[in-house]
Amino acid sequence: MAIVKRGGRTKTKQQQVPAKSSGGGSSGGIKKAEFDITKKKEVGVSDLTLLSKITDEAINENLHKRFMNDTIYTYIGHVLISVNPFRDLGIYTLENLNKYKGRNRLEVPPHVFAIAESMYYNLKSYGENQCVIISGESGAGKTEAAKQIMQYIANVSVNQDNVEISKIKDMVLATNPLLESFGCAKTLRNNNSSRHGKYLEIKFSEGNYQPIAAHITNYLLEKQRVVSQITNERNFHIFYQFTKHCPPQYQQMFGIQGPETYVYTSAAKCINVDGVDDAKDFQDTLNAMKIIGLTQQEQDNIFRMLASILWIGNISFVEDENGNAAIRDDSVTNFAAYLLDVNPEILKKAIIERTIETSHGMRRGSTYHSPLNIVQATAVRDALAKGIYNNLFEWIVERVNISLAGSQQQSSKSIGILDIYGFEIFERNSFEQICINYVNEKLQQIFIQLTLKAEQDEYVQEQIKWTPIDYFNNKVVCDLIEATRPQPGLFAALNDSIKTAHADSEAADQVFAQRLSMVGASNRHFEDRRGKFIIKHYAGDVTYDVAGMTDKNKDAMLRDLLELVSTSQNSFINQVLFPPDLLAQLTDSRKRPETASDKIKKSANILVDTLSQCTPSYIRTIKPNQTKKPRDYDNQQVLHQIKYLGLKENVRIRRAGFAYRSTFERFVQRFYLLSPATGYAGDYIWRGDDISAVKEILKSCHIPPSEYQLGTTKVFIKTPETLFALEDMRDKYWHNMAARIQRAWRRYVKRKEDAAKTIQNAWRIKKHGNQFEQFRDYGNGLLQGRKERRRMSMLGSRAFMGDYLGCNYKSGYGRFIINQVGINESVIFSSKGEILLSKFGRSSKRLPRIFIVTKTSIYIIAEVLVEKRLQLQKEFTIPISGINYLGLSTFQDNWVAISLHSPTPTTPDVFINLDFKTELVAQLKKLNPGITIKIGPTIEYQKKPGKFHTVKFIIGAGPEIPNNGDHYKSGTVSVKQGLPASSKNPKRPRGVSSKVDYSKYYNRGAARKTAAAAQATPRYNQPTPVANSGYSAQPAYPIPQQPQQYQPQQSQQQTPYPTQSSIPSVNQNQSRQPQRKVPPPAPSLQVSAAQAALGKSPTQQRQTPAHNPVASPNRPASTTIATTTSHTSRPVKKTAPAPPVKKTAPPPPPPTLVKPKFPTYKAMFDYDGSVAGSIPLVKDTVYYVTQVNGKWGLVKTMDETKEGWSPIDYLKECSPNETQKSAPPPPPPPPAATASAGANGASNPISTTTSTNTTTSSHTTNATSNGSLGNGLADALKAKKQEETTLAGSLADALKKRQGATRDSDDEEEEDDDDW
C-alpha cells in the first residue's frame, strides 16, 4: 500500500523479513531492535489470509502452533477464529480491555475485544445495526465469547456519570450469571453448555450512543434435561446451586436438602464438576436477581417452583393389584402439593389417571377416568416438572426484558449478540438434537449468504474483476428439514403424523417412520434406516432415532395437568406461569395447537431476518479436544471442524475479494473532508457527480489504483489497511483544525508575551543598564592595557552570558552533561575548549574538553568511549578557593593557566584554551577576589606537583598560523598580531528596523533557515577552527583544482542575479514582512567563501553578499564586509561595474563516470513494500543492491537515505548512468591585488576576489562553478552544524574523529616530558 497508516498505530509483525547476514564492514549490519516486553512473540500468522499455502492442513498447523503458545485467536479477514483453551489465560482483564479501546484490529493482536470494538465503532461511525454470529460445536467457547463481547461494549459505551445508563449496563451484565444458572448445564463435552438459544439486543441512544435498553429473545430450552440426563451429565446449574447452598429460610419453607436427595439431580451420578464453584455461582445468581430488580416475593416464587420440581421428581410408583400405578409414598406427594398450593388428592389423580372425553357431533359425550401404568404415570409426572420449569424460564426471560426496557427514548440502532447451542452429535440423537442442528444449519446458511455468495454476486453485479470461488450451499439441507412444498420436509412430516394419530404416541412414531421414505426420496443428504434416519449436515452425518419424536414435537401439557395447576391458590402459578388462556387454547378444536417444530422454525426464520438486517461480525469457535483438558490438541478433531466450518473457502474468498465496499454517495459523505477539492472548512463544495468526487478523494489521498475498484454504484477497497488509513486521515482532519486554532491562539499569546518582554528589557536597560554588558566591561577592565584583544571580543554586541551550553535549562545538551557527571549545583559558566595534557613518554596534546564553573568549583569534563559508547567523565575538579593565580599572555591568544596553591596529581594546574577566556577570568575573579591575574610574554604553571613548565608566546606570520587562532609547538605558542591592548567595545549597534519580524510566529522553521542563511551572528561556543586546533588542514570537501586536460563545452548563459519577477514585492502583504530572497553569490565570492570555511575567521565564513556583490577594487576591506552583511529593508545603492578582466576561466570538462559504491540495479516493476522491513520500488528507478539473500535483496536508494529488503526478481542489473558527476570547475586566476595584500600581511579574501569576475563572460564561464561550489559549501556548513548540535550518538563519532585527527605538538618529545 502506498499510503501512511493511522497515526500512533503499530503495524502487526505478521511476516518475517529475510535476515541480513552479518557481513564485514564498518557499519556492522543492521542493529537489533529494542524488544517490547509487553508484547508476546508472534507465533504463526495472526491472519490466515497470510498463509503461503491455503490448505486445511496448513490452517490446522497454524492454529496448533498458536494454541500451544496460548494464542487462541486468529483472523480470516474480519472473521475471528477462537480455539477453546479450557483454562483462564488472563486475557480478559480490564487492563487488556483498555488496550483495544479506539484501536483497529491491525494495531492489536487478534481478540474478541477487537471484534467488539469494530462493532461499536461501525455503529457510531456509520449508524448501522450490528450483530455478531458466534458459531461452533458444543464446548467450543461460544458462551464465553458472548460474555466478553457484552463486557467490552458495556465498558466502552457507558458514561459512568449517568445513573440510568449505568443501571442498564449493570443489568445487561447481570443477565449472564442469571441465564447461565437456569439455562446451562454440564454435558459430556462441555461443563457450561448452553441448553437454550439466546439473542441479546442492546439498544443505543441517538447521538452519543449510550445503551438505553436491551431485549433478550429465547430459543428452545432443552426441558427434557430437567427430568433425565445421560450418565456423567448434570441437570441445569441452578438445581445444584440451590440444593447445596440454600439459605436457611428456604430450607425450612421448602424442605430443601442436598442434591443427592433428589432423583432429578442424582440419577446421572454427577453432582460435582471440576472447575465449577456452585457456592460462588449461587451468590452471583442472587446478586444478579437483585441488580435486575426481582423483588423478594418474586425470588421466593422462583425458588418455590424449583423446590416443587425437585419434590415432584421424587414421587415414585408401585403397581396395585390391577397392575396400575399407585403412589409409593403419599408424604412426598403431599409436600409437592403444599409447594404447588393444590389439593393433594387432585395432584395424585392428575398423575396416575387420565381423563378422556368423547363427543358425538354437537352433543356432549361421556367422560372417562382411565388409570395409568407405572411408565405412563412416570411420563405424566415428568411432563408436569418439565412444564413448570419451561414456563418458569420463559417468565424469567420476560421479567428480565421488562427491567431492560429502560426509558421510553426512541432508539433505532442496536448491537445483537447471538449465543446459541452448538452443533451436537451424540450416541442417541432425538428431537432436541434435530432442532439444535437445524438452527446451526440456518446460521451456516446466513454465513454463506452474507460472506461468500453475497460477496461474489455483488462483484458480478457491480462489474468488478473477480475470480469465482466454488462453495457448498447448505440450503438443500435446510429445505430437507423445514420445507412444506413441493416436497414436505421432516417438520411437516412430524406435524402430519401427530394429526393422523394424535392420541397414541407410538402409532404417531410409526406413521412418521413410514413418511420418511417420501421425505428423502430424492435428497442425497438423507438416508432412511428403519426406525432411524441419517441427515448429512455440513458438520457431519448424524443418526436420529424416530422413537419419541412425535410426542416431543407436541410440546403441550395434558389437559389434566393444566386443570391441576389452574386450581392452585398461588397466583404466581395459576395466573403468571399458567394463565387461563392455555387451557382454552387446548380445548379449542378449531385450531391446531402449535408444535415445537413450528415454534423453532418460526423463531429461526425470525432470527435470520433480524440478522440479515444488521452488519454481521463472525466468530467461529473450535473445540480442540473431547477431554476438556488444557493444552490438549486433537489434530483430527480440529481438522474435521476446519473442513465443515469452511475455513479454507473463507480464506480463498478473502484473498480474492475486497475488504470494504460502499456506495458512492455514502463514501463521499464519509470522506469528502480528505480532499481540498471536495471539502473546505467542513463544508461539501464539490459540484460534480458522486463518482467523480470519489475519484478526487482517492487521488488526493494518494491511494494507488491497485488498492480499489469502482463499480457501477459502489467503490471497493481491497485491503483493510487502506480503509484504516482513510479513517485515520479523517480523524486527524478535525485534530488538525483544532491544532490550527490552538496555534493561532498561542501565536497571539506569544506575540503579546514577546512584546511585553521587549518593553521590560528596554526599560531595565534604560534604567539600570545591561548587566551582561556591564559584566563584560568589568572583565575587559581586568585586562585593559595589558593584553592584546581579538576582534571578535571587541564587538559591540558581545555580552558575557555565562551558561553557553545551557546547563541550567530543564532539557537539552547542557542538562544532559550535568546529569551524566552528577553536578547538582547551579552553573555560572559553561563552554567548550581544549586542554594541554602531557602523557607519559609522549608529547603534549591539545584535547577537547568541557568546562563548567559553579560557585565552588571548576569541572573539567572529558568525552571518552567505553565499549563504543560515549561517556562523560569528570577529569578534574578544581576548587575555586584553592586557585593561586591565573596566567595569561600579552597577545590575542586564548590560553589560560590555572595555578593552584597546592596542586596534587588529582587536582593539578591546568593549561586550557577556550574562546571565552576573558569571561572565565572575570567569573573566577568575581567568585574569588584573592586570585592574582598574571599577564606577561610567558606563562608558568606546574605540569606536575613541583615541576614548573614555562610556555613562551611570540608573534608569528607563517602560513600555518590562523588569523584568529594560534599554533602550539614545543612549548611555544605562535599567534598573529591582535588589536591594541587599549581597545574597548563600542556601543551595541542599534537594530536595522524598529518593526517586529512577525514571520517567526507563522513559519518558525523557515524563519530560522532564512535567518541563518541571510544574517549569521557569531557563535562563541563553536570549536576552534581546524588550523587553530592543530589539526590537519584537510578541507571537508575538495578544493577545485585546475584540470590538466579538458574539452571545451558550450554552456547556457545563466546570470547569478535574480530577475525582477523573482524578487518579492514588499507591498504584497502589509501584515507580514517576508524575508527578502538572497541572490546567489558571484563565482569569485563562492571561492572565497570556500577558502574561508577551510581556515579563515568565523566572521568571514558567515559573510553573505547583498544584491550587488561586486565591490570596487579600491574600496577598503571593512567597507566591503559591511556592505555584504547588511540586511536592511532599504534597497542597496547600485555601484558602477568593475572594468572587465582580460583573462577568464576555461569551461569545465565533460562529466566523468564515478564508480558506484555498490552494484546498481534498475527496478523493472513497482513494489509496494507492504512487508515489514521492506522498501518500496518505483519502476525504472536505479538502486544500490548491497546484499542478496535467496529471493530477497538488501536495497539502498542512491542517496543512501533509505534501506530495506525487496524481491530480487523485481530488479535487473544495469550500468551506473545515474551516478555521473561533473568534474570540479577550475578556480579563477588570481588577480594582482592578492599579491599586494599578501605583502602587507593582512589578506582580505572578499575584497580581493570580488574584483576579479565582474564581466558577463566571467559569469557565463563560471555558471557551473556557481552551483557546484554553492552546493559544496552548503553541504559543508550543514554537516558541520549537524555535528555540533547532535547529542550522545553524534558526540561519539565526533570524539573518534577528534582523537584520530589529534596530532602531537611536535615530532620530538618535550624536554620536560622525560622526567620519570
UniProtKB/Swiss-Prot annotation:
Q: What name does the UniProt record give this protein?
A: Myosin-5
Q: By its UniProt entry, which SMART domains does this protein fall under?
A: MYSc, SH3
Pfam families from the entry? Myo1_CA, Myosin_head, Myosin_TH1
Q: Could you state what the record's PTM comment says about this protein?
A: Phosphorylation of the TEDS site (Ser-366) is required for the polarization of the actin cytoskeleton. Phosphorylation probably activates the myosin-I ATPase activity.
- List-wise, which residues carry Phosphoserine? S366
Q: Where is the composition biased (Acidic residues)?
A: 1305-1316
Q: Which UniProt keywords apply?
A: Actin-binding, ATP-binding, Cytoplasm, Cytoskeleton, Hydrolase, Motor protein, Myosin, Nucleotide-binding, Phosphoprotein, Repeat, SH3 domain
State whether keyword Lipid metabolism applies. no
Query: Which gene specifies this protein's sequence?
Result: MYO5
- Top-level taxon: Eukaryota
Q: Name the segments for region: Actin-binding.
A: 414-497
